[in-house]
């Protein structure tokens, strides 16, 4: 089941660590909340910071009683270091302390982690909003028909693998790199998929399926793309197509020797007739 979040009293940011540079966005007006809610919010953010320092890639926390309960979580990308994960969560929670103190719901996405809190429980729910999209726009695929023979199958493969990888060191995280050789040329294809561990396997599958639908809408002509939903993500990166030498009429020395030998044998056979 998909839960669409009400964006009233909502703070949504894209933030950056290192090379990526994304502008922060505040989508709504600010309102003041009771001191009890603010205290619970600060407790949740502090708890998330502390657990990220322990090497966790995912954690959720709850503080307070209704109507001032605050729910929070973080999820780090499965292929970054534990130190990078902790640094990302620390930066996000500190930014929330500074920029979102008057909001009852907040998301922060970056290239390495996602951090959020809300006054409504979102645990175990599949959500398709808000979502972040990033993809190459000035570096489109020269021959998309060649890549499209491989990319959909690779994404389908990861969607099947991710829900069954809950017991791996980073639950629900899978990645793969493949060198693809076709008649037209060769290229490297890297892809990854990840779900939040609070989802059950079937919900993980549903979430990733929704992301694939977004890929087909936004990014089918892009060399790389990243789509993050609140509970799952997909990424891929395709190298430039490298033409095969044989497809350009170029032969290696070995091929040339083989060709001359074959011709000599055929001439000898014909002369013997």
Swiss-Prot record:
InterPro entries: GNK2 (IPR002902), GNK2_sf (IPR038408)
A Pfam entry, by short name: Stress-antifung
Coiled-coil region: none
Segments forming domain Gnk2-homologous: 22-122, 128-241
Signal peptide: 1-21
PROSITE patterns: GNK2 (PS51473)
Gene3D superfamilies in the record: Gnk2 domain, C-X8-C-X2-C motif (3.30.430.20)
CDD domains, A to Z: Gnk2-like (cd23509)
Compartments reported by the entry: Secreted
Primary residence: secreted
GO cellular component terms attached to this protein's record: extracellular region; plasma membrane
UniProt KW keywords: Repeat, Secreted, Signal
Family: Belongs to the cysteine-rich repeat secretory protein family.
The name this protein goes by in its record: Probable cysteine-rich repeat secretory protein 6
């Amino acid at each position: 089941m998909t839960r669409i979040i009400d964006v009233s009293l909502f703070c949504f940011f894209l933030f950056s660590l290192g090379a990526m540079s994304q502008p922060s966005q505040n989508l709504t007006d600010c309102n003041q909340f009771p001191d009890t809610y603010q205290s619970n919010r600060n407790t949740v953010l502090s708890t998330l910071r502390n657990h990220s320092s322990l090497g966790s890639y995912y954690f959720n926390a709850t503080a307070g009683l209704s109507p001032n309960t605050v729910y929070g979580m973080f999820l780090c990308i499965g292929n970054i270091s534990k130190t990078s994960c902790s640094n990302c969560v620390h930066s996000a929670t500190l930014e929330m302390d500074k920029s979102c103190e008057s909001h009852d719901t907040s998301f922060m996405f970056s290239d390495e982690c996602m951090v959020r809190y809300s006054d409504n429980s979102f645990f175990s729910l599949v959500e398709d909003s808000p979502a972040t999209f990033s993809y190459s726009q000035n570096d489109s695929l020269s021959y998309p028909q060649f890549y499209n023979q491989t990319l959909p199958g690779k994404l389908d493969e990861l969607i099947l693998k991710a829900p069954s990888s809950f017991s791996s060191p980073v639950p629900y995280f899978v990645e793969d790199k493949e060198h693809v050789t076709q008649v037209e040329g060769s290229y490297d294809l890297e892809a990854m998929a990840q779900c939040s561990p609070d989802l059950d396997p079937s919900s993980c599958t549903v979430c990733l399926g929704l992301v694939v639908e977004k890929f087909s809408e936004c990014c089918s002509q892009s060399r790389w793309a990243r789509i993050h939903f609140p509970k799952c993500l997909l990424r891929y990166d395709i190298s430039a197509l490298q033409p095969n030498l044989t497809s350009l009429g170029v032969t290696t020395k070995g091929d040339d020797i083989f060709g001359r030998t074959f011709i000599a044998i055929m001439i000898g056979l014909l002369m013997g007739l």
